[in-house]
Amino acid sequence: YLMRQLFAAPFRELDQIQNKIDEVEEEAFEGREKKMLEEVALLKQKVLDFRRAVKPQQLTLESLLSQGTNFYGESVKPFLTDLVGEYLKVWNLLENHKETLDALYDTTNSLLAAKTNEVMRAFTILAFISFIPINFGHIYCFHML
């Protein structure tokens, strides 16, 4: 029972992360790419920290499943199998969150790059348009001297 509760706790945290990912997905195309990029980076860090905490438990649980039946008897095998199943659910959710955040990061980064390109295009056009009158002014000014 205690071990099952230990694996139930991460689901609450993963649900909070999922809710935040959903919020970021909804806001990603509303023109706040820089803020979204920061939020996605923070969420990626949370998921990475979570993965670092959960991954080492895999070997422990697999060892417990194989050796626990020898020590406690075959009657505990279904419970240990359930624990491994809970672990796999947590790990699969973390993998899903990681992939979603990677895709969101790439998308948001692309949107930010597209906006930057638009600004650079506008500045290039402005520079070209202002170059011609400035050149004529300089040429005319030199001829006056």
Residue ranges and their predicted role:
Residues 1:
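Divalent-cation
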Residues 142-145:
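Membrane-interfacial hairpin junctions
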